[in-house]
Amino acid sequence: ASFSEAPPGNPKAGEKIFKTKCAQCHTVEKGAGHKQGPNLNGLFGRQSGTTAGYSYSAANKNKAVVWEENTLYDYLLNPXKYIPGTKMVFPGLXKPQERADLIAYLKEATA
């Protein structure tokens, strides 16, 4: 199923998901710097593997996907399947509602 078929995302619920499942490796604030994973500020409309100052896997650079709702929705289901060879060890979010919520949060928090 694609993002267009996903339930409406709730940014508040998405923030909770981010804090419990993503924040140990990612920051969203402008200028917050990188952790184990890259800072996600300015994520929407950016090509994978291009955040300045972060050392990406060749897989992330070579995928050359532009991050937006549809690509994030597919990626967050199973990151290692979407970008084989990615350094991101996160297993993914199986529930469409959780992915929609996280994307709604990221759209606000990374802008």
UniProtKB/Swiss-Prot annotation:
Location within or outside the cell: Mitochondrion intermembrane space
Coiled coil stretches, renumbered: none
Pfam families in UniProt: Cytochrom_C
Transmembrane regions: none
UniProt GO molecular function: electron transfer activity; heme binding; metal ion binding
Residues reported to bind heme c: C22, C25, H26, M88
Gene3D superfamilies assigned to the protein according to its UniProt record, in alphabetical order: Cytochrome c-like domain
Cellular component per GO, a single term: mitochondrial intermembrane space
GO biological process: mitochondrial electron transport, cytochrome c to oxygen; mitochondrial electron transport, ubiquinol to cytochrome c
Maturation and modification: Binds 1 heme c group covalently per subunit.
Name recorded for this polypeptide: Cytochrome c
Species of origin: Zea mays (Maize)
